[in-house]
From Swiss-Prot:
Residues 495-515, 823-843, 971-983, 991-1003 have a biased composition (Polar residues). Residues 889-970 have a biased composition (Low complexity). Interacts with RAI1; the interaction is direct, stabilizes RAT1 protein structure and may stimulate its exoribonuclease activity. The interaction also stimulates RAI1 pyrophosphohydrolase activity, probably by recruiting it to mRNA substrates. Pfam families: XRN_M, XRN_N. This is 5'-3' exoribonuclease 2.
C-alpha cells in the first residue's frame, strides 16, 4: 500500500522497532553461501517474499544502469533473492508471491501509475534524443548501441505479459536448483504463487498465514518474516495478530544515491559502473520488529478511563483502521490527514477521547461499527479548519525559508567571485578590483551616472566591501574568511521549525551571529526573486468556504442541491471503501468487482447522518470473480505499452473504430490538488466501464493462439520440496504410485498444512532445463526435488486474538521509553502517572524466550480459552468435584497447559485432534466432565454472556460483543459465518450464512 513517508514516520516515532540486519558476507556468488549456518539475526521459521519489491529494482534500477536483457534481469533477481534468504535463513517454509490479477479497487491506482510511467518514459526518451543531438553537434562520438537503445518498459511487470510468464519459469527453475544443490534447503518447503494466481502478492501471503492459523495443530510460536518495500506490510503484520513477526526491507535512506540522469548513462565509464555495482552489493537492510511496535502501541493506545476491559488486539485493529484514512492503495486519503502532518496522531487522539463514550471498539475481526466511525470522524471534523490553516502556515514558512536560503547562497557565491580571484600569490600590494555591479561613488558619496546601482539595502549590506577596496590581498583574504564563517553560522541558524517561539529565538540568534547584517524582510525577498509557479489551487483550504469551493472546483457543480447529492454519494462510497479495505486486510477480498468511483475523498465533516445515507440495506459485497490477466492489462495499460498484449487485443487501444478507444487517452490532466511535486498530483483518467471492456474482449478471444490463451489462464500455487523432505515419499507414492487426485496434509508433520495436487507439467523422472540463454547454470534431474500444485486449507473466519500457547518475547521497552511515549520526555512531576495494566509485576521466570517471560495477554471476551475458563469456574462454584479420572483429559490447569506446550488443546490424547470429533478441543463427553447434562443446559438458559454454540474447530463463536453486523455482509457463495447468536440480537435469515442485527455491525 502506497503510504508515502509512513515508514520514516514510524521509525522516528517508535525508534526501537528498527534494527540493522547482520550479514556474514554479501558478496558471495549464488550457491556459495552457508544457508545452514546459525542465523546471526535470530532463527526464523517462515519467510514470505513480496517479489514485486525485488523484480522492480532489479529490472529498472534508479541509481545504476539497467540490465541490457531480460535474462540479465532474472539473474539479478536470483542474486538479490539469494542475499535476502541469507539474511533470513528460514527453516520451514519459504513463500514467493508475485502480484497476480488485482481486485478492481486496486486497478484504478495501477492504471494511474502505468499511464504516468508511460508518459515519463516518453519524456525521458525525447530528452535523451535531444542530448545525443547536442553532443554530436559538438563533435562528440556516441556509441550506436546507446543511440538505438530504447528504455525497457516497466509496465511489463503486470500479470499476463510475456515477461511475467518468463519470470515464473525462471523462479521455478531457481527454486528447484537451490533444493537440489544447497544442503541447507533440505527441509525447506517452497511455495511459488506467480502472476497466474489472482491477488496482490502481499495479500496472497496474508491469506496463507490466515489459512495456517486455522489448522488446529498450528504452532502459535511460529516465527514469521515478510520481505517487501510497501508500507502496508507493517499493517498486514499487525493484522495477523502473530507477535513473532518481522518485516525485512532495504534501508532506502542509507547512502542515498541520486537518480541516474540521462547524461550519466551517455558518459559513464566501466570503472564507474563497477563502483556503483560494488556500492549496490553493500546496501544495508533493516528489520522492523512487529512485537516491539505492539509494545509501543500497547502503551500509547491504553486508556485508563474505559468502562470495559482494555483489549490490545482490538485496539491494534482500530489503530490499523485509522491509518487507512491517511493513505492506502484503494481510496484517496481524507484531505485533512497526512502522515507528514502527524495525521495518525491527530486521529488517534480523537479515538482515545471518544472510546469511553463508544463503550466498545470500532472494529471486530475486520467488521466496522459504522455509528462509531461517524462519531470518530465527527470528532475530527472540529479540527479540520485548524488543520488546514496550520498546514498552509507551515508551507508558507518553508517557502519563505527556502527563498532566504537560496538568496543567501547567491550572495555568498557573488562575494566569492569578487574576493577570490584577487587573492593570489605574489600580489600582496595589488588593490581589489571593484565588482561591475558596485556603484562608482564621487567624493561626496553620490553615485556616478552610467554605472549599475544597487538598492540602498544592498549598499548598506556591502558597505564593508566598498570601503575596503584598497585593502591588501592578505587583509582581503582574512575578511573573506570571516565573512564566509559568518554566512555559514547564519545558514546553520536558519532551520526554522513550526514553532513561533523557536522562530523568534532563531531570529535573535541571526542578529547575534552575523556581522553588520539582519534578516531581510520577506516582501523584499519576494520582490527580488522570481515567484514560484502557482499550483492552480482554486480551493484554498485555509480560507472560509473551502468545502463549497472544493466540490465546485473538483466536480464542476454550482447549485447547493447538486453539491449535496455528490457529497452524499461520495460519503456512501467512501464508507463502502473503508469497509472493503478492512475486510480485505482481515478476511480476504470481499469483492473482486467493487471500486471507489471518485478521484477525491470527502471531508470528515461530511460524514453525518450515516444511517440515512447507508439505508436499511446496509453495506453488502458480492464476491464475484477476478478479472483474467488480459482483462486487467486492458484495464491498466496505456496504448504506449500495448506491445505487452497479443496483437488481436492491442488493436483495441489505437484503432479509431474501437468501441473502447476512449479508455486510452494519450493526453490527460493532472490535478496538483494543492501539492508541489508532480508525483503527488492526481491523474484524471476515465474509469473503466467493465461491461464495455469485457464485451469488446469476448469478441476477440477466439483469435488468440494456444500460448496466448495459456497466459490468460488463472492457476494455483506450486509447492516444491527436496527429496530429503519428510513428506517426499508420501507425496510421491500417493500422487504417482496410487494415482490419488489430491492429498491433504496437516501442520504437525512438517509445519505446513494444505492440499497437494499432481502437477501436469512435472515429470518425476524428467529433466528441468535452465530456461535462460545467459548465465551458466546446469539442467536439473527431477528426481532431486518434487513439484506439485498446492491449495491452502479451507478458509475460515479469522479472529483478532492471540492463539492459546503463545509464548511472548522479553519486553524491549524500558520505563524511560514508556514515559517518553506518554509524556514526551516532559514529566512535569507526573512521573509514570498512567501506568499500563501490564507493568513489571507481570514478569515471571518461566518460558524459553529468555530469563523473564511476559505473562500471556489476558483472555479476550468470547475467546475459546475464556469459554473454558468460565465453564470451569462456574462448575467449581455450583457442582461437586468430579473424580480425577473424569477430569484427566480436560484439565486446563495441568502440565499440558503450560507455556512450554505450543499446542495445548488435548493434543497428547487420542492422537491429537480426532477427525470425527465436532469439538476438536475436547472429546465428545467434555461437557459432562464438568457437569451433568442439566448444568450444560444452564449455560444456554442462565448465562447468555457465555452462550457460544461452537460448531467448528476454530472459534467462530457466538459472543456478547454485538458484532453480527449489518454493515458489511458479503456474499461468499455459500461460505458464510458459522456462528449463531442467542444474546438478544436476532439475525436476519440469509442462505449464504450472512447474519446481521440492528446495531450497525457487519459480519
Amino acid at each position: 500500500m502506497g503510504v508515502p513517508a509512513l515508514f520514516r514516520w514510524l521509525s522516528r516515532k517508535y525508534p526501537k522497532i528498527i534494527s540493522p540486519v547482520v550479514e556474514d558476507d554479501v558478496t558471495q556468488e549464488i550457491g556459495a553461501a552457508q544457508f545452514s549456518d546459525p542465523n546471526p539475526n535470530g532463527e526464523l521459521d517462515n519467510l514470505y517474499l513480496d517479489m514485486n519489491g525485488i523484480v522492480h529494482p532489479c529490472s529498472h534500477p534508479e541509481h545504476k544502469l539497467p540490465p541490457e536483457t531480460e535474462d540479465e534481469m532474472f539473474l539479478d533477481v536470483f542474486k538479490y533473492t539469494d542475499r535476502v534468504l541469507l539474511m533470513a535463513r528460514p527453516r520451514k517454509v519459504l513463500m514467493i508471491a508475485v502480484d497476480g490479477v488485482a481486485p478492481r479497487a486496486k486497478m484504478n491506482q495501477q492504471r494511474s501509475r502505468r499511464f504516468r510511467s508511460a508518459q515519463d518514459a516518453k519524456i525521458a526518451h525525447e530528452e535523451k534524443e535531444r542530448q545525443i543531438r547536442e553532443r554530436e553537434s559538438r563533435g562528440e562520438s556516441i556509441d550506436d548501441a546507446i543511440k538505438g537503445k530504447k528504455s525497457w518498459d516497466s509496465n511489463a511487470i503486470t500479470p499476463g505479459t510475456p515477461f511475467m510468464d518468463s519470470l515464473a519459469q525462471a523462479l521455478r527453475y531457481w527454486v528447484a536448483y537451490k533444493l537440489a544443490t544447497d544442503p541447507g534447503w533440505a527441509n525447506l518447503q517452497v511455495i511459488i504463487s506467480d502472476a497466474t494466481v489472482p491477488g496482490e502478492g502481499e495479500h496472497k501471503l496474508m491469506s496463507f498465514i490466515r489459512s495456517q492459523r486455522s489448522d488446529p495443530e498450528y504452532d502459535p510460536n511460529t516465527k514469521h518474516c515478510i520481505y517487501g518495500l510497501d508500507a502496508d506490510l507493517i499493517f498486514l503484520g499487525l493484522a495477523t495478530h502473530e507477535p513473532h513477526f518481522r518485516v525485512l526491507r532495504e534501508d532506502v535512506f542509507a547512502n542515498q544515491s541520486r537518480q541516474m540522469r540521462i547524461s550519466d548513462q551517455l558518459s559513464m565509464t566501466q570503472d564507474q559502473k563497477d563502483s556503483i555495482a560494488e556500492q549496490d552489493a553493500k546496501k544495508p537492510f533493516l528489520w522492523l520488529h512487529v512485537n516491539v511496535l505492539r509494545e509501543y502501541l500497547e502503551i500509547e493506545l491504553y486508556n485508563p478511563h474505559l468502562s470495559f476491559p482494555f483489549d490490545l488486539e482490538r485496539a491494534i485493529d482500530d489503530w490499523v483502521f485509522m491509518c487507512f484514512f491517511v493513505g492506502n492503495d484503494f481510496l484517496p486519503h481524507l484531505p485533512s490527514l497526512d502522515v507528514r502532518d502527524n495525521g495518525i496522531d491527530i486521529l488517534v487522539n480523537c479515538w482515545k477521547r471518544m472510546l469511553p463514550k463508544l463503550r466498545d471498539y470500532i472494529t471486530c475481526d475486520g467488521n466496522l461499527n459504522l455509528e462509531s466511525v461517524e462519531k470518530l470522524l465527527s470528532s475530527l471534523s472540529y479540527k479540520e479548519d485548524e488543520i488546514f490553516r496550520k498546514r498552509h502556515e507551515g508551507e508558507k514558512r518553508r517557502e519563505e525559508n527556502d527563498k532566504r536560503r537560496k538568496l543567501a547562497q547567491e550572495e555568498e557565491k557573488a562575494l566569492k567571485n569578487q574576493y577570490i580571484p584577487q587573492v593570489s600569490k605574489g600580489s600582496d600590494k595589488a588593490p581589489l578590483t571593484a565588482d561591475i555591479n558596485m556603484p562608482l561613488l564621487s567624493t561626496s558619496g553620490d553615485a556616478v551616472e552610467g554605472y549599475a546601482q544597487l538598492s540602498n539595502k544592498d549598499i548598506v549590506e556591502n558597505r564593508d566591501v566598498i570601503t575596503k577596496a584598497n585593502m591588501s590581498n592578505a587583509d582581503a583574504a582574512a575578511a573573506l574568511k570571516k565573512l564566509l564563517d559568518s554566512k555559514n553560522n547564519k545558514e546553520s541558524d536558519k532551520n526554522v521549525s513550526a514553532s513561533a517561539a523557536i522562530q523568534e529565538q532563531q531570529n535573535k540568534s541571526d542578529i547575534n551571529t552575523t556581522e553588520n547584517s539582519k534578516k531581510r524582510p520577506i516582501d523584499q525577498v519576494e520582490a527580488e526573486l522570481p515567484k514560484p509557479d502557482e499550483n492552480g489551487d482554486s480551493v484554498r483550504m485555509w480560507e472560509p468556504g473551502y468545502r463549497q469551493r472544493y466540490y465546485q472546483s473538483k466536480f464542476g457543480v454550482v447549485s447547493e442541491e447538486e453539491i449535496n447529492k455528490i457529497r452524499r454519494d461520495m460519503v456512501r462510497c467512501y464508507l463502502e471503501g473503508i469497509s472493503w479495505v478492512l475486510l480485505y486486510y482481515y478476511q480476504g477480498c470481499p469483492s473482486w468487482q467493487w471500486y471507489y468511483p471518485y478521484h477525491y475523498a470527502p471531508f470528515a465533516a461530511d460524514f453525518v447522518n450515516i444511517n440515512d445515507i447507508i439505508g436499511e440495506q446496509g453495506i453488502k459485497f458480492t464476491l464475484g470473480e477476478p478479472f483474467k490477466p488480459y482483462e486487467q492489462l486492458m484495464s491498466v495499460l496505456p496504448a504506449a505499452s500495448g506491445h505487452n498484449l497479443p496483437e488481436v487485443l492491442r488493436i483495441l487501444m489505437s484503432d479509431p473504430s474501437s468501441e473502447i478507444l476512449d479508455f486510452y487517452p494519450e493526453e490527460f490532466q493532472i490535478d496538483m490538488n494543492g501539492k508541489k511535486m508532480s508525483w503527488q498530483g492526481i491523474a484524471l483518467l476515465p474509469f473503466i466501464d467493465e461491461n464495455r471492456l469485457l464485451e469488446a474482449l469476448e469478441k476477440r478471444y477466439h483469435l488468440l493462439t494456444d500460448d496466448e490463451r495459456e497466459r490468460n489462464t488463472l492457476k494455483n500455487e506450486v509447492l516444491f520440496i527436496s527429496n530429503q523432505n519428510k513428506n517426499y515419499k508420501r507425496f510421491y507414492n500417493e500422487l504417482y504410485d496410487n494415482n490419488v487426485k489430491e492429498l491433504k496434509f496437516r501442520f504437525s508433520r512438517s509445519s505446513l498444512a494444505g492440499t497437494v495436487i499432481k502437477n501436469e507439467y512435472f515429470v518425476p523422472d524428467g529433466i528441468t532445463k535452465f530456461p535462460l540463454s545467459e548465465g551458466d547454470m546446469p539442467d536439473l534431474n527431477n528426481i532431486e526435488f518434487f513439484q506439485s500444485s498446492y491449495k491452502m486449507p479451507t478458509k475460515k473466519m479469522g479472529k483478532s486474538m492471540l492463539i492459546n500457547g503463545y509464548i511472548s518475547h522479553t519486553r524491549t521497552l524500558t520505563q524511560e521509553d514508556r514515559d517518553s511515549i506518554l509524556h514526551g520526555n516532559q514529566r512535569n512531576g507526573g512521573y509514570n502517572r498512567f501506568r499500563t495494566p501490564n507493568d513489571n509485576s507481570g514478569y515471571v521466570n518461566k518460558g524459553p524466550s529468555g530469563k523473564e517471560d511476559y505473562l500471556i495477554y489476558s483472555m479476550r471476551r468470547g475467546g475459546y480459552r475464556a469459554f473454558m475458563h468460565n465453564l470451569k469456574n462456574q462448575n467449581q462454584q455450583h457442582q461437586q468435584p468430579v473424580p480425577m479420572n473424569a477430569m484427566a483429559n480436560n484439565s486446563y490447569d495441568n502440565q499440558y497447559n503450560s507455556y512450554s506446550n505450543n499446542n495445548n488443546y488435548n493434543n497428547n490424547y487420542n492422537g491429537g485432534y480426532p477427525n470425527q470429533s465436532n469439538n476438536n478441543y475436547s472429546n465428545q463427553n467434555s461437557y459432562n466432565n464438568y457437569s451433568n447434562q442439566n448444568s450444560y443446559n444452564n449455560y444456554n438458559n442462565q448465562n447468555s454472556y457465555n452462550n457460544y454454540n461452537n460448531r467448528n474447530n476454530h472459534g467462530n463463536y457466538n459472543n456478547y460483543n454485538r458484532y453480527n453486523n449489518q454493515g458489511s455482509n458479503y456474499d461468499r457463495q455459500g461460505q458464510g459465518n458459522a456462528s449463531s447468536n442467542r444474546s438478544g440480537y436476532i439475525p436476519a435469515p440469509n442462505r449464504t450464512g450472512n447474519f446481521r442485527n440492528r446495531n450497525g455491525y457487519n459480519r
